[in-house]
Amino acid sequence: NEDALALLAAARGLPAGTAFAAEDYAEVNPYCFAAPVSPHIAAAEAGVEVNLNLIRALADRAAAKNDWLVVEGAGGWRAPLSDTASMADLATTLSDPVLLVVGVRLGCLNHAVLTAEAIRRSGLPLVGWVANHIDPQMPRVAENLAMLERLLGSAPLGVFPHDRSGEGTSQAALTAFDRLTVVIEQVANLR
């Protein structure tokens, strides 16, 4: 995954395009599927069972070697990873604070509120949220962000604009990583 490689390079202070050993890559991205579908479908098509204990062990190892650790979800809070596990189960297994990423598009208000409620019910701390502009044509973005602030009870820790630059995925990932670093430092201060 080009984004994972770019983020791995940025996290290590190396230039984009740096080659890594397969073991290094697998430690930060143990599951990578080609099909852009729900994780449980992609895993089944690849003949792989997502193992939450493996992810927990890799996360513990990475946390021991680094100042902070970010675990990116896929598909949403309740997205199934298998017939028996979901992203919510993974978050509970890791027992880390949760940063909600709100995909800014039509329907995001309802989706964000329901997700925030589910996270809080899980017992995990919801430390904040960021806005990720998915739909560059969405009208009334400012009004939706203001309503999200009111409904979620806090201002966004970051607002990530839609990438209109036409930059390659690696450059976009590095730019996002720089912005994300600021957000993570804010979250670390909230703990």
Model segments located where?
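Structural motif
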Residues: 70-72, 99-101, 130
